[in-house]
Amino acid sequence: KFKGAKGRRLFPIECHDIMCKIGEVVVVGGVRRSALISLSNLGDDQMRHAKSGQWWENEGQRALANNSVAFKGKPEMGTFMREWTSLYESKSGERGIFNRQAAKVKASENGRREIDHEFGCNPCSEIILRPYQFCNLTEVVCRATDDLASLTEKVRMATILGTLQSTLTSFKYLRKIWKDNTEEERLLGVSLTGILDNNIWTEEVLSILREVAVETNKKMAKDLGIPQSTAITCVKPSGTVSQLVDSASGIHARHNDYYIRTVRGDNKDPLTQFMKESGIPHEPCVMKPDSTTVFSFPMKSPSGAVTRTQMSAIEQLEYWLMFQRHWCEHKPSVTVSVKEDEWMDVGAWVYKNFDEVSGISFLPFSDHTYAQAPYQDIDETKYYALSSEMPESIDWSKLADYEKEDTTSGGRELACTADACEVVDLTSN
């Protein structure tokens, strides 16, 4: 593939593919130890179309990374419309939007952060990072029964945990700059998930909870003898955590009243073989048919849950903006589901609010190009039909019969933005 590059500098798309491939194969302790985002120049046409068409057939490694365009500020209307049209035509939600100037403005708001840096973000785009810097994430699970008092206590505990984690700065195999940045900023990432399972949210409530996090960290940092964190609050996409705790993911609505949830497993993993022989519906992964199996589970949302069919794209964006302004010192990660007749209005909203759009990704409401998508809509009849095909029970004690040797393999979690953070891999833990 790279023979044609002999004697010249690599193109960004070639560097991107190399990094994606490295991310795919580097495994430590049986877990894939990489997460990737590519922030590319506005004029980079190859990166703009990296996930256009049937990209997974020949460039499957690109599923390992999120792709966003790094705007330096609000572009001219014509420039914005060309990029917006490309995003629409890709049907994959990429490239997403990352506004470096908006990120810098957001980082400056609390007055605690040095902003003379070329800020980027983490792969899921909820943490504003300098170069050579880490995330430090903790999560609050919001339940329908939570009130301000219980959420206050959850935020306090998550902040204490994150502050303790910020003291772990012994990075023996990294350059000193990583340690210096980590110790100087002591970043936290106190996140909320299950947001739309509760209707408590107002600007006042969010501001109160943010202040709880800031004051808790300030006191805890003083007790530990470390600097106060320069940025604390965010909203993670929480695709995996939400599955574990049965909540809506991050700031997103639940997918639908009835849907299919897909889960990936490595064919060498004893758990994959056990689930196959237990009768759970499965098929080969279209991107890795020889090594990966996709399992399908019919799901039903809890009664009264907010689903994505109940929120317009503009409502999702306005909700995002409220959390951006009143909860986050970093930013809320979001993938906005856009119906076919909403793209023009959504583009107008994004352009109007561009100075605050630090980072957002978009995905067509239904006909996106990801095969074996993490969520697939079904109706009630289909749900009960598929449920009848599921095994009545599984004797998990028999899993030991399959675990004859160490067959640990790297979990291949796909990238987080544009719906792919919802991909769950059974071998990732």
What is the meaning of each model-derived region?
Residues F2-I13, A144-T152, K172-W178, N198-L206:
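Inter-helical turn/loop segments and adjacent helix faces that build the functional surface
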Residues G30-P75, T169-K179, L192-P237:
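Internal maturation/activation junctions in enzymes
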Residues L87-E89, N99, K106-L174, E184, ...:
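Catalytic alpha/beta core of large soluble enzyme barrels
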Residues T408-N429:
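Short acidic, low-complexity intrinsically disordered linear motifs used
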